[in-house]
Amino acid sequence: MTIKTLALQCRDAAQVVSQLSSQAKCALLQAMAAALEADAGTILAANARDLEAARAKGTASAMLDRLALDDKRLAGIAAALREVALLPDPVGRITREDVRPNGIRVQKVRVPLGVIAMIYEARPNVTADAAALCIKAGNGVILRGGSEAIHSNIAIARALQRALREANVPEAALTLVEDLRRETMLELLQLNDIVDLAIPRGGEGLIRFVAEHARVPVIKHYKGVCHLFVDASAEMELALRLLIDGKATRPSACNSLETLLVHADIAERFLPLAAQALRERKVELRGDAATRAVLPEIAPASDDDYAAEFLDLILAMRVVADLDTALAHIRQYGSDHTEVIATQDPDNAERFVQSLRSAVVMVNASSRFSDGGELGLGAEIGISTTRLHSYGPMGLEALTVERFVVRGEGQVRH
């Protein structure tokens, strides 16, 4: 079956999903969560095959972490589906209502986007997360995962499709592309008359490929080069907590810290504390000349380091003269993802917030909160640094659009 045929079937199924009541979608997602739990053994066995193949190919540790499933992670995925089931339904929400002087009633109402293509790499959890979010928002979804997770993705998709069938919803509403040839993905990205939106999740190379070759609209972020600026007024203990949580808890996440900027006035006090805490957590440090004057044992940092999304236990460091220098550094090397300031100066905090265009800006809070669930969206399908349609972590609302519904009693314009 061709990718165009699959997409057409998904579009037809999306029409069915768009008509489901909120209660029906909630019950469907609960059933999908139960199906994952029922198939846990099959899914974990499939994931073990993927992990074995990935290790044999020498896959990087960050990628292996994203690929791996276990009982706890699978239970977390099922729990996430149940959380999505209970989220408020954005479909049908009236966001504006007005009666015009001629008596027509004008409403802006949220409706599903239609068919969403998810293009992703070694993240089997995305198969379930994306399916749940797209269906809750009344859409069909075409899932094209990476070859690294093919067995995991098939096992997860089969379980979810069974729940769709049992609810009398066409299983094409959740279409997994098993043909992983690049030309098939290219064809999918050209189907702008069928597919309404593409969302790539993965490495910078994949995302740039999708953005450069798609005729379908794309929401994306290329990478997460996230900074922590420790201001002169920062509380040391607070700044250390933000640094450790942001860098060492899950370095493979796109909201982890990649660069530490420290105000020159506190560098001699803060850097040794930071270095000790990070070394205890096996973080490799690289710094500029001013940083290495305080920490001579660390490696020098290059321009490439400051622009890098390491996704690993590596941190670039730089001493800056003031807030303006920190802002200039972030503008030069940042990726508009997430930036953090540790400060007790409210004026500097406000300048930091107002001076950056990043999708998420944090004041005295960890970069790891740059996540749809943590920010109150309930769940997230991705993070956008594209300013059109959606910006920042994207939840259910980002998978809908507003349209006008006008009700009258025979009014005409002329």
From Swiss-Prot:
Keyword Cytoplasm: yes
GO cellular component, one term: cytoplasm
GO molecular function, one term: glutamate-5-semialdehyde dehydrogenase activity
Keywords carried by this UniProt record: Amino-acid biosynthesis, Cytoplasm, NADP, Oxidoreductase, Proline biosynthesis
Any one of the GO BP annotations: L-proline biosynthetic process
Classification via Pfam families: Aldedh (PF00171)
Family: Belongs to the gamma-glutamyl phosphate reductase family.
Xref: HAMAP family: ProA (MF_00412)
Stated name of the protein: Gamma-glutamyl phosphate reductase
Name of the encoding gene: proA
